[in-house]
Every structure is written in C-alpha cells, then in structure tokens.
C-alpha cells in the first residue's frame, strides 16, 4: 500500500542532493529534500519526517530487535515526545566529535516549533544524547520537551536508558517517562530484546502507566522476520 519515489545527484561543487516522497494508502504521507555539504554539514527540508535532525530523531533511542516496549499499544503516545514534522527546516553538523542538529518550523496558527539535539560517543561502545524542544501553538496548547539518555554496547549486548519529560501548558497534563532496554545478538542472523517503560502522569489520582515488551528478529538473506510481544498496565494513568 506504500509507494515511494527517491532521487539523488551530485552538483558541480561536490555537494549532493537527495529527495524522497512517500505515498501511503493512496495519499501523501511524507517528503523530504536533503542537501549534503560535506564538512559543512547537511540541511533538510521535511514534511512528515524528521530528517534525522532535532528532537524528532531522538523519539526513542533504546536498543530493540523489533518494536519498542510501548509501541502498538493503546497508550503508546503517553510519555513519548512528539516533534513537529510539518514543513520544517533542519541543519546538522559535527563539532569536536559531537553530532549537533537543530530544526525549526513556522505553524499556520502563528506559533512555531524549534529544537536542539546533541549526541556524543566519549568512548568505544558508549553513546550519550540530549535533546530539547519548545513549541508554541496558542494558549493551553504549548509544550516544552526534554529527553536524555545513553547506550552501552559490549560484544553482542547493548543496554540503554532514556528519560523524557513533557511539560504542557494545559493543567495536569505533564508526563515523565523512563525507558530501559537491552538487546542481544545471538548470532549474525538472530537478535532478541527486552524493554520496560514507565510513565508518570501529573495528578495525584493517576497511576503510573507500565509497558513491557519482548522482541525477536531473524534475518535470512535479504528477508527479515520480526515479532513483538508487548503489554501495558494502567493506560493513561487509569487502572
């Protein structure tokens, strides 16, 4: 049901440009244009996609063999940051070994969204990251988002932790999420993973939403088979 169109080319100055457009279920889904300027970084012009820049690229960086522990559940949007992906401009580059990126979009209601993200590998097998965004879309519809965490890889095992805070201008709407996960490559074809996510809602009457899941993937040549087994308790803070 998905049809994608892609194209790329190199300009006379050595820079490369690439484009994609995705049609899903017979309608427009996303499109993007990327200008790779080499050592000067890259610029993206996206609609419906993150383009790898800004906070949208750090929605969830935890290791998994299939789906994240919170995915495909009734409360999957709870505690998960949502970067605005509508008609946005992004830029990314490398500074002193750190990958730095920003993005910005102007919204139709007069508001705007902008974000900054940084990730850094201080040593082999270790990656740490932090990202922050603010979005103004009118009274009681604005929010600030922050996420940070890290992963560590030793041999065939990768473990990670990520913490996300969503501060909404509406009353009693803030959410904080902690996600831990681990993956293990049994061999070059088979991988397994486990994850657990807890969402803390603002409001004394709400309980913590607890998500957990197990994933597995198996690759045979160019084909991959994946499966996820996820469960959730206290969805939306209600038992």
Sequence positions of predicted segments:
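Outer-membrane beta-barrel proteins
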Residues: 1-239
């Amino acid at each position: 049901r998905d049809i994608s169109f892609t194209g790329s080319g190199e300009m006379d100055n050595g820079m490369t440009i690439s484009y994609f457009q995705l049609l899903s279920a017979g309608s427009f889904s996303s499109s993007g244009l990327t200008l790779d300027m080499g050592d000067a970084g890259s610029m993206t012009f996206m609609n419906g996609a993150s383009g790898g820049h800004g906070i949208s690229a750090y929605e969830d960086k935890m290791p998994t063999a299939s789906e994240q522990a919170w995915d495909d559940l009734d409360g999957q949007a709870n505690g998960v940051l949502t970067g605005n992906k509508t008609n946005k401009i992004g830029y990314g580059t490398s500074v002193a070994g750190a990958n730095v990126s920003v993005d910005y979009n102007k919204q139709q209601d007069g508001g705007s969204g902008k974000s900054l993200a940084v990730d850094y590998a201080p040593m082999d097998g270790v990656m740490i990251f932090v990202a922050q965004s603010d979005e103004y879309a009118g009274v009681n519809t604005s929010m600030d988002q922050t996420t940070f965490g890290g992963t560590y890889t030793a041999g065939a095992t990768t473990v990670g932790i990520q913490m996300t805070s969503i501060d909404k201008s509406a009353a009693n709407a803030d959410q904080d999420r902690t996600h831990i996960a681990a993956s293990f490559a049994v061999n070059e074809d088979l991988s397994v993973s486990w994850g657990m996510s807890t969402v803390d809602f603002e409001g004394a009457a709400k309980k913590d939403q607890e998500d957990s899941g197990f994933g597995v993937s198996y690759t045979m040549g160019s084909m991959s088979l994946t499966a996820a087994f996820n469960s959730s308790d206290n969805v939306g803070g209600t038992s």
